[in-house]
Amino acid sequence: MNSQLTLRALERGDLRFIHNLNNNRNIMSYWFEEPYESFDELEELYNKHIHDNAERRFVVEDAQKNLIGLVELIEINYIHRSAEFQIIIAPEHQGKGFARTLINRALDYSFTILNLHKIYLHVAVENPKAVHLYEECGFVEEGHLVEEFFINGRYQDVKRMYILQSKYLNRSE
């Protein structure tokens, strides 16, 4: 079933789905962002960033065209060939193994199409399931950031994790 997941560019028609994700406090706490964004604000952001080469945003569809989640590469730096990775799986689709498939698809795109050198992410220390998943996908801890983000009324530590193109491309050899 995971093989039937498709990454495609975020389109204006997907904004209602994104709006629902962005207004879920639990989801946004994992992205270290403020929830409860207005739809007008989201549309403005979409219009502002639609042609921004420093970002790639994808929605995830299953074979029936149901929206499953969102995958983003942001802060793309074409000199240093690096980008930050972010992922959201809609709550009703979590726990089905989709994240692992989508992480690998995003890494494949990053390293074989964009020819990036390094992909990094930030994950809450208090989210051991996500840390473990990222480690299984080849990410390595690069640093521990103390009280980096203010979420749910308190500051939280995060791990910065990374994977290099060479490690990803040589993983099966």
From Swiss-Prot:
Annotated residues for binding of Mg(2+): 33, 75
* UniProt pathway annotation: Amine and polyamine degradation; spermidine degradation; Amine and polyamine degradation; spermine degradation
**GO CC terms, sorted:** cytoplasm
Name the Pfam families for this protein.
Acetyltransf_1
**Name used for this protein in its record:** Spermidine N(1)-acetyltransferase
- Active site (UniProt): 134 (proton donor)
Q: Specify where it is mainly localized.
A: cytoplasm
Where it sits in the cell: the answer is: Cytoplasm
Name the chemical reaction catalysed here. Answer: an alkane-alpha,omega-diamine + acetyl-CoA = an N-acetylalkane-alpha,omega-diamine + CoA + H(+); spermidine + acetyl-CoA = N(1)-acetylspermidine + CoA + H(+); spermidine + acetyl-CoA = N(8)-acetylspermidine + CoA + H(+); spermine + acetyl-CoA = N(1)-acetylspermine + CoA + H(+)
**Subunit and partners:** Homododecamer; dimer of hexamers. Exists in solution in a variety of protein homooligomeric states including dodecamers in an open state. The presence of the polyamines spermidine or spermine shifts the equilibrium to dodecamers and induces the formation of the closed, symmetric dodecamers.
Positions contributing to acetyl-CoA binding: 87-89, 94-100, 127-136
Record site feature (Could be important for selectivity toward long polyamines), residues: 84
Q: Which cysteines are joined by disulfide bonds?
A: none
Corresponding gene?
Answer: speG
